[in-house]
Amino acid sequence: MPKASEIKKGFAIESNGKTLLVKDIEVTTPGGRGGSKIYKMRCTDLATGARVEERYKSDDVVETVEMNKKAVSFSYVDGDDYIFMDNADYSQYVFKHADVEDDLLFINEDTQGIHVILVNGESVGLELPSSVELVIEETDPSIKGASASARTKPARLSTGLVVQVPEYIATGDRVIINTAERKYMSRA
């Protein structure tokens, strides 16, 4: 069984008899000598949908649950439901808007590399690719000769996500965004 320091976002863990899907991990290092790192995991209870916070020291052993992943593509929206289609057998996976709200900031009809996470045969979440290509919908005008400076400006992307981009980037440019850090990486 892995230690808490080896658990990543998207893992399914067993805690107090509940199966939890890890949505976010925050690492803190307490002051003082010899203090081990504390891993605060924000999770969703797969049975009830409730949000749960678990805390572990870096060397605590955490019980994981076996997961499967299937490659999917975003298909369409039906009211409050977001439908993703299996790339192999064309079966569909339905997610409520609230369940995938954060992930939707990185997904458009062209996004490749999305995986649905299955626990005990049931779809519980999405795994995004490490980076996605998106179009800048709105940003301040680019400044000629600004490539020499390291200043940034906010830009709203086609999915609604707002990131800081270099000053030379203009509206309509295609950019690559790191999904884990929510940061600009490069032009596409």
Swiss-Prot record:
Taxonomically, the superkingdom here is: Bacteria
Supply one GO molecular-function term.
Answer: translation elongation factor activity
Pfam family, any one: EFP_N
Q: Where are the transmembrane segments?
A: none
Gene3D superfamilies with a match to the protein in the record: 2.30.30.30, Nucleic acid-binding proteins
InterPro entries found in the cross-reference section: Elong-fact-P_C, NA-bd_OB-fold, Rib_uL2_dom2, Transl_elong_fac_P/YeiP, Transl_elong_KOW-like, Transl_elong_p-like_YeiP, Transl_elong_P/YeiP_cen, Transl_elong_P/YeiP_CS
Tell me which positions the record assigns to the signal sequence.
none
Q: State the PANTHER family in the record.
A: ELONGATION FACTOR P, TRANSLATION ELONGATION FACTOR KOW-LIKE DOMAIN-CONTAINING PROTEIN
- According to UniProt, the name of this protein is Elongation factor P-like protein
Origin species: Vibrio vulnificus (strain YJ016)
